[in-house]
Curated annotation (Swiss-Prot):
Lineage: Bacteria, Pseudomonadati, Pseudomonadota, Gammaproteobacteria, Enterobacterales
Listed name of the protein: Potassium-transporting ATPase potassium-binding subunit
Keywords annotated in UniProt: Cell inner membrane, Cell membrane, Ion transport, Membrane, Potassium, Potassium transport, Transmembrane, Transmembrane helix, Transport
Organism the protein comes from: Escherichia coli O81 (strain ED1a)
Predominant place of localization: membrane
Underlying gene: kdpA
Membrane topology (UniProt): Multi-pass membrane protein
Subunit record text: The system is composed of three essential subunits: KdpA, KdpB and KdpC.
Gene Ontology molecular functions: P-type potassium transmembrane transporter activity; potassium ion binding
Name of a matching Pfam family: KdpA
Function statement: Part of the high-affinity ATP-driven potassium transport (or Kdp) system, which catalyzes the hydrolysis of ATP coupled with the electrogenic transport of potassium into the cytoplasm. This subunit binds the periplasmic potassium ions and delivers the ions to the membrane domain of KdpB through an intramembrane tunnel.
Membrane-crossing residue ranges in chain numbering: 5-25, 63-83, 132-152, 170-190, 253-273, 283-303, 329-349, 356-376, 379-399, 416-436, 484-504, 526-546
GO terms under cellular component: plasma membrane
Subcellular location per the Swiss-Prot or TrEMBL entry: Cell inner membrane
Source superkingdom: Bacteria
Annotated family: Belongs to the KdpA family.
Amino acid sequence: MAAQGFLLIATFLLVLMVLARPLGSGLARLINDIPLPGTAGVERVLFRLPGVSDSEMNWKQYLCAILGLNMLGLAVLFFMLLGQHYLPLNPQQLPGLSWDLALNTAVSFVTNTNWQSYSGETTLSYFSQMAGLTVQNFLSAASGIAVIFALIRAFTRQSMSTLGNAWVDLLRITLWVLAPVALLIALFFIQQGALQNFLPYQAVTTIEGSQQLLPMGPVASQEAIKMLGTNGGGFFNANSSHPFENPTALTNFVQMLAIFLIPTALCFAFGEVAGDRRQGRMLLWAMSVIFVICVGVVMWAEVQGNPHLLALGADSSINMEGKESRFGVLVSSLFAVVTTAASCGAVIAMHDSFTALGGMVPMWLMQIGEVVFGGVGSGLYGMMLFVLLAVFIAGLMIGRTPEYLGKKIDVREMKLTALAILVTPTLVLMGAALAMMTDAERSAMLNPGPHGFSEVLYAVSSAANNNGSAFAGLSANSPFWNCLLALCMFVGRFGVIIPVMAIAGSLVSKKSQPASSGTLPTHGPLFVGLLIGTVLLVGALTFIPALALGPVAEYLS
């Protein structure tokens, strides 16, 4: 079993790196404001028609463009879900959503979280899925990538005030990166058996002779961008464990690759744009080390079986509860770590049914800020915050002003870095405390004791860090939970983007200083270890008390 797990991890990472390297070169061209071959003419026409200026923006203008697009998308999606029953492509005549569920869902998809307090096949029409959710899957992913584009330019430009043009970046990312790759993935899914139709739900007779209603819909097109954009919201309630979304072992492998593809490519692109590919490899090494250790822990925990079942005399040599037998325990463990290391949230197994340690690792990966590969764009700019913090700590130890890529890191940057890093832990801990204060909110827990608290802690961790997966034992479709989680998702997304853009605006105006004998190398194994230690230290100091009340207490009981 250990050899199989090692081979699975190694194969996954090898194929991932092979695919991400050329994509990273293409992204580097876009960051350097070089159109991809054959696209410049199309871009000129698309900007000329609405009269949009393609001149460069400062950080405030860039930020306002990103926020404006997302706020407009939030309003459109909210009213679309409320009035779903008036819109076309609703063969099941599904009603509009309640205001709190519509708000939660709109915020969820605009923030790239895709938390779902509903069952897709019984709640949303084809129009809502396509024109509402799928569109936001593209736009939220493009927004995250645009922010990291701006931050990378801030490190590589000198004595400037502009970071590029948000509309140019969003257009290029959507048209030349997300759309073509998602199309290829969708066609592959269709070839493998994923649904893509507009038929009404089909009544069929099962082999036992009973009647069953099979849901239909344009699944493959949404599934592709759901994975590629690290969105994660399933067309069906069972998400990627549903055979209509994820029909074969091959589609499952491609889904895992799609989740990590752009975050990995962005690391390669960062090194190329910075003029030192070792910088990108340093980030990949740090992410990969944490990732491999986490996968190993989850695989080990799930292979050990459920000790509570063993105590009752049941055969539980491995923990298969809540897992698809066609994927097995090792693949389910790998997928769980992939989807929570990235801010995806898609699942092929029920994380609520994992062992105490097996469920704690995905929760902890979210709590440290989704920086182990992370979401498209958001993962890398989240890790860059820890890079700045690690550089600052190293500067304190050697008595020098911290610098990164030749840029001095001053008090302003460190204050903004601390603010951005503290946003999500504050939301998680305060949200969990608020949810545990009254009987009404605690009644949403379907399990007592430490595991019930773990369900609450997982939910707010998932929402605040824009992941979207859940311990499904929590009944979250209530006004309190919909509003609380919507607030966590909104602040967790934009409360980090705003200081990140402010950091970019500060750095882009600085000159790059040449390296000296006292400059800390940020591309070697020493800095990789320092960066990993910084991530672990912040995660440990912040969440160990809360984890001790949940999964740790459950493991020890």
